[in-house]
Amino acid sequence: MAKSPATTPSPRHAFAKTLKTFTTASGKTGQYYALPVLAKTYPGIARLPVAMRIVLESVLRNCDGKKVTADHVAQVAQWQPKAARTEEIPFVVARVVLQDFTGVPLLVDLAAMRSTARKLGANPKKIEPLVPVDLVVDHSIMVDHFGTKKALDLNMKLEFQRNRERYEFMKWGMQAFDTFRVVPPGFGIVHQVNLEYLARGVYQKKGVYYPDTLVGTDSHTTMINGIGVVGWGVGGIEAEAAMLGQPVYMLTPDVVGFEMTGRLREGVTATDLVLTVTEILRQHKVVGKFVEFFGEGTRSLALPDRATIANMAPEYGATMGFFPVDEKTIDYFKGTGRTKAEIEAFEAYFKAQGLFGVPNAGEIDYSQVVKLDLGSVTPSLAGPKRPQDRIELGKVAGQFESLFSKPNAENGFNQAATKLLTRYPLHRTEVTATTVAPPPVPEGAARTVSEMESNKPRLETARTNAVTHTKAPAALAIGNGDVLIAAITSCTNTSNPSVLLAAGLLAKKAVEAGLKVQPHIKTSLAPGSRIVTEYLTETGLLPYLEKLGFALAGYGCTTCIGNAGDLTPELNEVITQNDLVCAAVLSGNRNFEARIHPNLKANFLASPPLVVAYAIAGTVLTDLMTEPLGKGKGGKDVYLGDIWPSSEEIRALLKYAMKGKAFAANYAKVKTEPGKLWEHIKGVTGTAYTWPASTYIAEPPFFDTFVIQAEANSKEGTGGNGQKGMQSVQGARIMALFGDSITTDHISPAGS
């Protein structure tokens, strides 16, 4: 907090009179642009959705009469819930978050601008992001090795071999820019790291405090909405503009209020809830809208449950799934190791602004209100092709059987019904351990296209050190509905201790009951934070997950984005030769066909404990509500109800998952102990990048003629339009026109 009064704002600021002072619990003071003062001019502010008030604060504070004007302030302050949406809002964010796939091109652009500045004789340091930028490396690790305690180390070594050139470039960016940070590989997934570490609640500049707001280059940036931070995913151009201090322009949104009442029933998880919310909001068509959660049911939700729901805003179509700040938000900040000063400033600021607390019914004017009784939520999965297609647990087998013979146009698989139960022999040896061949590692930074294409495990050796504690049956048959990938993955669920502990408890009971997972099933645990494995280890649950094949495979997106690695050649052969409809079950957020693996047509989203359960069952054709998971000790049938953990058992272990000192110590290592693999990466130094002779990290040609034009301008002046060298785009054409339900996932390089 500021120890002395902040500098008085420029008299040119149209709303200087709204600048006021707030005081924290420790008596420290800070200044802020007060919405309650602005409400004297615009009394409707008190009934604005909380998310819109945070947007209003940004517009108010950044009102410079140029990019952001007094008219923009009035426009947002007088937001009407059912008005026509024709006006844009210039929204200036506090920071930007990037993941490595989409973040590297932005860093390339910054490097290109610095190179151009140097060529022009200008200081390259003048090219600098004007807001903090964090890049979290999470999209590069793949599950090549699985089912063994060595999997993490082996997968990370492959990751660094494949991505050395990219990582060298990122290291240059770290030392070249003052406002650019990198969270190295192996720390987690960007959205979970953002939730646990990067988010600060409020920021301050020259003594003036303002809410944490952001945009990110990943659609699931919305996870941060769970702690009351306004932010969403944008394209690279918008993110780059935000990095350089420009507003993000958005059409004034509708805000859908989502009222939650009641409480979740025993045995129902946050995953079941988010799949239900996704189904409901898809039906209400919330694309391009904000969704804001309110009501007494919302207040009852734990913070990680809120984050899980916010994470899947892209799946239900909304720009945001926003949860206002309240006492549970403050408790989460305490439990994740934020400092006392940060927490006090966060709480005092939001209370001073009238932004603290989850609204009650009737307090806010929303464009539309949707209601859900939490007591009506049941155990569910979503799939097999879309995240909004929720299926109650007891109906999964029947739904798969129904879709099996339906045409593709009806979300089916267009197979002959008579083939459903046919099984095909898997021709393989009993040995379950083969090794991934190390990829070629060329000397120097330059790589040929051929090298990049071959820089992955060969198909014939893609079977990894699988579950080596047992041997596969000599005679194994594969059929439709068989689960071949079971992955505890994705920030959506691994940020939530309740479902991770539930998975561990279920694994413990399953092992004690004598249940096993067949070794041909590719099982993996890839959480979004190291904290997960810390508390699973401390509670003694990790060894039980490992015994079922769910050994730690990496800290990153992995299976959720298609980085599941390959199946064995034998499995691929039997699937393709017989056109089988086999399945993946994962705790992710998207399940479009072939996203998880090109040969797996059915993909189901499920809670982590259900992922473990389906791995044991081995097929989605088993009704887990009424049929046994398998045979346990003494040939006894073991049912899901026999091993499902109670809410009381889960609550008893939650204390191990929210230790502030553990979070602080873990994320301190981002700077102090980033890992030997990262430390051994040799980054280029200097304020401007030295471009290698590379086909991958290459200097873009956008500024090739910039020097000539600049020289021409200095000698001849600009052209008639005052913008010599600017060229119109002419003759542009659509590259491809797709039908419904085709998304960027289908063309994304992630997992390819």
Language-model segment annotations:
Residues K20, G30, A382, Q388, ...:
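Cytosolic catalytic domains that perform sulfur/thiol-centered chemistry
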Residues G257-T261, S367-G375, A732, A736:
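Short amphipathic
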Residues L19, R85, P124, Q204, ...:
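Generic recognition of flexible, low-complexity loop/linker segments
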Residues D64-M260, A270-L275, P379-A382, K395, ...:
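Long, structured ligand/cofactor-binding scaffold of large enzymes
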Residues V286-V287, K406, Y696:
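Long non-globular sequence segments
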Residues V92, L110-E165, E292-A446, T626-W691, ...:
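Terminal amphipathic helices with adjacent charged low-complexity linkers/tails
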Residues A199, K205-A352, F356-G357, D373, ...:
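Mobile "lid/hinge" segments at catalytic clefts and subdomain interfaces of large enzymes
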Residues A2-K3, P9-E159, G188, L301-N311, ...:
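N-terminal amphipathic, basic-rich helices that act as targeting or association modules
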